[in-house]
Amino acid sequence: MSFDFRIPRRTLLKGIGAAGLGTALGAGGIRPLYAKGLAPITIVVNQSPWFESFRRTVEAYEAATGNKVELDVNPFAGSLEKQRNSVRSARGQYDILIMNSGWFAEMYAGGFVEPITDIDPGFKLDPEVYTLGDTIYYNAQKKTVTADGKLMSIPVSPLIPMLYYRGDLYKQAGLSAPKTFAELEANARKFHKPPGMYGIVQRGARGPHTVAYDFYPYLYGFGGGIFKDQSAGDYSVTLNSAQGREALDYYIRLARTAGHPKTAASDQAEVIQAMVTGHAAHIMMVIAAWSQMDDPNKSVVVDKIEWAPPPSAPGLPTAPGLGHWLAGISRNVPDDRKRAAVEFLRWFQTKDAQLETAKAGGIPVHAAVYKEPIADERKYRWMKPLAQALPNAVNIYQFPEASEVIAVLEIGLNRAVAGEISSVDALNGMADEIHKVMNRNAYKSGALQPLK
């Protein structure tokens, strides 16, 4: 089911303090004033945990400028379908597309998104906005998502997985947040007392982007990867490297020795449920779930959860996989709506607008917000760890056919976690299938020797 609704203009917004926001943003933003009296715009967006904060930020924009915004709200798959239909029509229905990390490359490579600086050559990206693996840029000539390309979008929600852990248990045991995988494993085993308490609960279920997404911090944190160098156009498959084997062996061992017995059937809802009901000492979960931990209507561990960047192997940085959202402007809409969309993005990227996003429960895309007093408040204790992790976030896919690779990973990883096949067979099999995908789509690719 989808929801079409026009957000009303307000002169005063309860709970968000938007009265006077236009003046404040004008004083501290990129431009002294934001354009008013623009054409109304329509944004197609998905119904996600962060949507409410986005909606309230849009309301603040309307109050500050008087400009009108309509939100077309849909389930995850429904949003993608509507975007695909709109960009392929003679005249687009949606001015701003809220694109997920799994499909933004499709929109860039297909020429469906207009570069922001082509619409307004004077547009400047705020230097403190996270570029999230440079995924806001696209070099059409090289077909790469790299900073030498044009500015295609502005980040909306910089989602990455973080380590959620029971701070109260850590305090009692005299432990500090784990920085290495060895420390995480030792701590998970220490707290593992099933069925009342599991050392860690992981996702292992097969889905549209489920077990694969949870595996990325381990794969890249051990120094592995799926491809050799996407930014250079080298799609040689490296999944079945020694590092890849170490990562998958670790993931499976963690599940079997300190995890839930039904890891292979666990999806996001089950993982979150284990944490909020007090049955998990650790989970690796997208940061958007933070508010559920302190919601007394859902959680028995209110004020007991802490956050840390995902661990990594010694000498390597944390490597959370991006699962973020970007806002791009559709190419097939009238020029006046394109210009109005640019003004919204110009406003949205500012520190002041992003501070309002944080106050509304969202995840800011502006680095300066994480240095504000709000980050020292107990309620927002996740902000500083997130700020540490974001600069190291990994863009997993830079090509339009990513869904074909994800489907291969979902099957192979799920079977390995379930014990149906060995990690070696899983990695070799997935690598072979991914190599076929890349060859079929005419990418420069290669393969490693199979693991023994």
Feature locations, PLM:
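Glycine-centered hinge/linker elements that transmit conformational signals in sensory
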Residues: A188-P194, Q230-A265, E306
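Extracytoplasmic "Venus flytrap"/periplasmic binding protein-like
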Residues: K36, A60-Y137, D168-K179, A274, ...
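Long, aromatic- and glycine/proline-rich binding clefts that accommodate carbohydrate-like moieties
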Residues: A35-G37, Y130-T131, T135, I305-P310, ...
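Extracytoplasmic/periplasmic solute-binding protein
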Residues: G29-I30, Q141-V156, P161, E185-S236, ...
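A bilobed periplasmic-binding-protein/Venus flytrap-type ligand-binding module shared by bacterial periplasmic
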Residues: Y164-G167, L322-D336
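Short, solvent-exposed loop/beta-turn-alpha elements that line the ligand-binding surface or hinge
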Residues: T117-I136, G204-A205, F222-E246, D295-V300, ...
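N-terminal secretory signal peptides
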Residues: M1-T11, A18-G20
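Hinge/lid segment of periplasmic solute-binding proteins
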Residues: G102-I160, V211-D214, K304-A308, E377-R378
